């Protein structure tokens, strides 16, 4: 089997004024692989996510994406239209704040259905059936399909955002602190849901988090970032159980029983 | 009525007309795409058809014959004043007959009588942006048009069906033009939407306050958005016109007294009059 | 026959950056080879580095020096230099590890925890569950518990879940870290049977057994792990 990476980044560099936000970052994401980027606030992990997903243009380096057709596209040269098309079909983006990823005034069914309609679904009954199925999968009572997310709890909103993102079966999902604003008990449920869906659908995920426990639960591979650089990377359990870099040791030591 | 002196032909100066014609040409070249133009102050307030008037003024010539309708009627205030305006500043002949007109300026209707090649239908448009209630950021609506990213409009239709069991848009029903641009057909009843599809006449849309012109060239595909299992259906009152008996035309409901009495009449006065005249001719023969 | 797994001059030390860069050597020059169907018990005093060696073999700790050669997909592979993706493949197909403690995943039923490695290897979910259920039942975990997440289970029950998960796929190489530590006599006998059956099928086993009775029953030989001169 000739397997190739979905996303390949080489030598990414980006400065905000004098501050290096990214400094020589390279990484690959393979099909079905969950990669977590951990590091403290300001380490450049969110910037890296934005550069990899084409939202931000780097000063140096390149990001290549291999589409379902097998052709490789440079993420920063493909043009906004192609990037948007990618964003609503083959890619997904789960935001920390569900308000950034949902239409708060549109019903739960409409939120899930939007991505289907954006890629051409035109059968109301089919869209509704699919939305119902996805609400069930993310453990939202399908009877609430016509309620708006404003009437949902934070955890439900985040689960709805995940349903909306995954409904088009993307191959690559970017997640930015998906459990960020939630209570601990709600976090556990969400993490487990993500873990299950990712495994079932064989998704590749790039997860940005400062939650080491979440990274351990979800990620196959871990990248530790500090001051715009990847200081250590490898198998999740090895990086966390046998950290080599001083900063990783500090990070792991700071966590309560990860 | 004599032609007013002291004005250029059709009120606007030639440079302005040229500028507007350039916008119209661009609009015709990109069916359904909104082209900005330098909308002028007109001698009537915004919302009274300043966009349509500027378009008409830019394309009208001495040999044209103008018809103006408001909600289908030739005899309402807005229609009468615009017709008199052009009679005065351009000295062109006017008509109430759809078949005789070369230019028809309209507010909120498409005539029942099918238009033919060579005719031009000018719509007065209050809000040219079909996405404006869904996406408040103007820059973002432009981006959505550029990317043909219209999932949002379908979300609106989905929400309608979820809430009301059917698509509850009765006028200004969104259409796709030439399979590319989403377009607001101005507040015509959804009943009129099918008339836009592959119409032999040129359709021009002018929005004065919003400073936009757009167009549908002759024989261009115009499709009302819908779902496979909830297809678009033009709706009219289930009645016959009280005057001409038409069961095909779009009807206005007229309240006749204070006791709930009402009747249905054709909204298109020319069409209704023609049919009544034909009945009388038949009776006379 | 060539070994299923062997090490060449394997060494491992830890550098504690948070304690002024203190370096703790744990293993050096470890040469261990295990044939298919052979069970080797690691011996040595507590703190000698038995668990560290196991974790190095599994890739949970990075090898400091030397090589770890595993027969994987018909060829020898050096785990000491394998990247993360290759390591995942090795763990999925060739190398199993039963640790002392179950890492509980919230909300996942016991049955699915055991079935998961089977599904990852391509077995249909229902077949994987059936096999998991059979193994759990053999380990005397009542079927009423199969649908529950093991978070609230006793230590012994959790360990049996862990054992079922480790034995279910039939890895060619299996690492056992105190597999019977908190089990009663009946369950120890079951584990004994599992180990013997695995050996008979050609599984190479490396184990740490504090239970000398079990150790003497299953181990073909002992491998002495020598404590490094730590904190020198």
What role is predicted for each listed range?
Chain B
Residues 241-245, 266:
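Short cysteine-rich clusters marking metal-coordination/redox-active sites
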């Amino acid at each position: 089997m000739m397997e190739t990476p979905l996303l390949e980044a080489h030598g990414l560099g980006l400065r905000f004024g004098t501050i290096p936000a990214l400094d020589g970052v390279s990484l690959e994401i393979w099909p079905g692989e969950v990669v977590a980027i951990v590091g403290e606030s300001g380490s450049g992990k969110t910037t890296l996510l934005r550069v990899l997903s084409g939202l931000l243009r780097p000063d140096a380096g390149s990001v290549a994406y291999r589409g379902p057709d097998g052709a490789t596209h440079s993420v920063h040269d493909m043009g906004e239209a192609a990037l948007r098309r990618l964003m609503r079909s083959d890619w997904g983006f789960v935001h920390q704040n569900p308000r950034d990823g949902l239409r708060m005034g549109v019903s739960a069914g409409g939120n899930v259905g939007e991505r289907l309609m954006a890629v051409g679904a035109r059968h109301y009954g089919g869209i509704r059936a699919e939305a119902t199925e996805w609400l069930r999968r993310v453990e939202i009572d399908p009877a609430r399909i016509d309620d708006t997310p404003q009437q949902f709890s934070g955890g439900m909103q985040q689960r709805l955002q995940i349903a909306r993102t995954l409904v088009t079966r993307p191959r690559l999902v970017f997640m930015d602190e998906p459990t960020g604003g939630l209570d601990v008990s709600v976090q556990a449920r969400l993490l487990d849901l993500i873990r299950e869906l990712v495994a079932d659908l064989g998704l590749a995920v790039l997860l940005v988090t400062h939650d080491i426990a979440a990274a351990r639960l979800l990620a196959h591979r871990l990248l530790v970032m500090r001051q715009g650089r990847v200081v250590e990377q490898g198998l999740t359990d090895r990086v966390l159980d046998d950290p080599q870099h001083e900063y990783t040791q500090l990070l792991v030591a700071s966590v309560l029983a990860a | 009525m004599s032609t007013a002196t002291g004005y250029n032909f059709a009120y606007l100066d030639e440079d302005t007309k040229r500028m507007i014609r350039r916008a119209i040409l661009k609009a015709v070249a990109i069916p359904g795409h909104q082209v900005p133009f330098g909308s002028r102050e007109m001698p009537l307030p915004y919302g009274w058809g300043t966009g349509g008037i500027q378009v008409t003024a830019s394309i009208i010539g001495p040999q044209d014959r103008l018809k103006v309708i408001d909600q289908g009627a030739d005899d309402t205030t807005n229609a009468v004043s615009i017709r008199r305006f052009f009679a005065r500043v351009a000295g062109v002949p006017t008509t109430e007959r759809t078949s005789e007109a070369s230019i028809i300026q309209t507010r909120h209707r498409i005539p029942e009588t099918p238009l033919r090649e060579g005719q031009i239908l000018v719509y007065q448009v209050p809000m040219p942006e079909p996405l404006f209630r869904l996406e408040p950021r103007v820059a973002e609506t432009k981006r959505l048009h550029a990317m043909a990213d219209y999932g949002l409009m379908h979300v609106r239709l989905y929400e309608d069906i979820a809430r009301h069991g059917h698509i509850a848009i009765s006028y200004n029903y969104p259409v796709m033009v030439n399979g590319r641009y989403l377009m607001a057909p101005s507040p015509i009843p959804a009943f009129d939407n099918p008339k836009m599809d592959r119409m032999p006449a040129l359709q021009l849309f002018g929005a004065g306050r919003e400073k936009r012109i757009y167009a549908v060239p002759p024989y261009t595909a115009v499709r009302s958005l819908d779902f496979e299992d909830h297809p678009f259906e033009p709706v009219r009152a289930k009645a016959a016109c009280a005057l001409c008996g038409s069961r095909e035309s779009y009807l206005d409901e007229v309240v006749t007294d204070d006791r709930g009495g009402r009747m249905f009449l054709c909204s298109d006065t020319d069409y209704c009059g023609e049919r009544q005249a034909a009945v009388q001719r038949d009776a006379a023969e | 026959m060539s070994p299923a797994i062997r090490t060449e001059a394997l060494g491992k030390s830890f550098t504690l950056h948070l304690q002024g860069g203190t370096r703790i050597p744990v293993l050096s020059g470890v040469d261990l080879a295990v044939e298919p169907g052979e069970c080797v018990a690691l011996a040595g005093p507590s703190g000698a580095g038995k668990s560290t060696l196991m974790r190095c073999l599994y890739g949970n700790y990075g090898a400091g020096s030397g090589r770890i050669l595993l027969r994987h997909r018909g060829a020898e592979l050096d785990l000491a230099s394998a990247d993360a993706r290759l390591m995942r493949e090795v763990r999925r197909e060739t190398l199993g590890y039963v640790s002392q403690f179950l890492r509980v995943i919230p909300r996942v039923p016991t049955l699915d925890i055991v079935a998961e490695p089977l599904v990852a290897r391509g077995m249909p979910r229902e077949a994987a569950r059936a096999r998991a259920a059979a193994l759990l039942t053999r380990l005397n975990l009542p079927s009423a518990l199969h649908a529950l997440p093991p978070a609230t289970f006793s230590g012994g029950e959790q360990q049996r879940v862990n054992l079922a998960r480790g034995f279910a796929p039939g890895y060619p190489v299996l690492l056992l870290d105190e597999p019977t530590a908190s089990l009663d006599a009946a369950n120890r006998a079951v584990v004994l049977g599992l180990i013997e059956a695995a050996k008979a099928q050609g599984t190479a086993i490396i184990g740490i057994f504090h239970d000398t009775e079990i150790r003497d029953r299953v181990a073909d030989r002992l491998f002495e792990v020598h404590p490094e001169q730590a904190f020198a």
